[in-house]
Amino acid sequence: MATIIKEHGIGIAIKRNKKKLFIEITMLGKLTHEDYQIFVPMIDKALKKAKGLETDLLVDMKKLKGWEFLAAWDDFKFGVKHRKAFDKVAIIGSKKWEEQSVAMMSHLMKGKTKFFKEREKALSWLLK
């Protein structure tokens, strides 16, 4: 009998220099509450240590298939908690609902928020 492995999770890259903090999140599969229990404390710690620095966020949702119910709630809480933390937020996706979500989210965020279909364009915008 074959074993089925469910691929899901969140990849994180955190880069920092003297003036800027850059966080990149890659979402894969259907996210769970446990995924958020792992990654949220990492982001919280990075933001706390970088207080006063310009902070940008890149979120790649191209391989995201959705959230379990509790994970969707975790995502909402994360967004509300950190709505003032980022100067720029670039979201990479390919679905219309993702683009519409970014448009709605932009009204809640302090910084600039923009949707992209291509990673290169998102990075270019963040680096301006």
Predicted feature descriptions by range:
Residues A2-K128:
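Amphipathic, Lys/Arg-enriched alpha-helical "gate/interface" segment within cytosolic domains
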